[in-house]
Curated annotation (Swiss-Prot):
InterPro entries for this protein: UPF0352 (IPR009857), YejL_sf (IPR023202)
Protein name: UPF0352 protein VSAL_I1058
Source organism per UniProt: Aliivibrio salmonicida (strain LFI1238) (Vibrio salmonicida (strain LFI1238))
Gene3D superfamilies documented for this protein: YejL-like
Lineage: Bacteria, Pseudomonadati, Pseudomonadota, Gammaproteobacteria, Vibrionales
Family note: Belongs to the UPF0352 family.
Domain of life: Bacteria
Length: 75
């Protein structure tokens, strides 16, 4: 999602693979996977981000998510 990151691609890919492996292990369908990822994002925001910054960080996160989607263009 991020264009630039202080984290290496290797670190990100390794953690992402491990998280996807857990979802695959439990045969989580798309709706459950999205619910879990959403709950993780909510927990991180509530526990790790100062209250006065949560809304703006959540909005930036939502914008980054939308911009990273593969959405077919319709004419």
């Amino acid at each position: 999602m991020a264009i630039t990151s202080k984290y290496s691609n290797k670190q990100i890919e390794q953690m992402l693979t491990e998280m996807v492996d857990v979802l695959d292990k439990h045969r989580a369908p798309a709706d459950l996977s999205l619910m879990l990822v959403g709950n993780i994002a909510t927990n991180v925001l509530n526990q790790e981000v100062p209250a006065e910054q949560r809304k703006i960080i959540a909005e930036k996160f939502a914008q980054a998510l939308l911009s990273s989607l593969d959405i077919p263009k319709t004419h």
